[in-house]
């Protein structure tokens, strides 16, 4: 019997992101804090992304018609979720440019979803692990590289910001949480490299992508869930 490895790992991710969403939402309601609200909505959308992906993966569904319908939704949920979190971070660091940052990130969401409305990669399974490839070069191919161009730049900037927050934080739990976010985002960057270069081009087994997802989810679970506490306003306003 083949075990749906990717599906089980993504299911774990669903619980992690939804739990984080609940925690930040409670913080938002208690503190009436704008940043906590964006984090809550962002984690909720990312969790929805994994719900949409996990359902067919658990049952090894590789029907192109199914993925053609689901792909625009999960890409929209994933991109929108991280964009909300990124907007909360960058708009607090550069408040005078918050509107421009919002427009920029909105364009990234639209450009990321656009190609999946016209073309969907081929999804298949290798020993219970989800893999994907391009059967042919689509006419919207340049748009597929939008996330791979801007996401590393955005994640790299956020990694630096959270490392600095961890370095300057006085509260131990705040320090752990900021450091955990930075490390998790580093592994997200590593995951992009694994997916795009090693697996797609280098023909490496896709299980390494799953392992990277598992590392990210585990880091988030330990650093954010188990070190959670209702932050005081002076910390939240600094995104700590």
Annotate the PLM regions.
Residues 55-63, 118-129, 193-203:
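Juxtamembrane "helix-exit" motif on the non-cytosolic side of transmembrane helices
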Residues 18-22, 83-86, 156, 160:
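Alpha-helical transmembrane segments of polytopic integral membrane proteins
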Residues 21-30, 86-90, 167:
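C-terminal ends of transmembrane helices
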Residues 1-7, 27-34, 62-72, 132-142, ...:
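Juxtamembrane loop-transmembrane helix junctions in multi-pass integral membrane proteins
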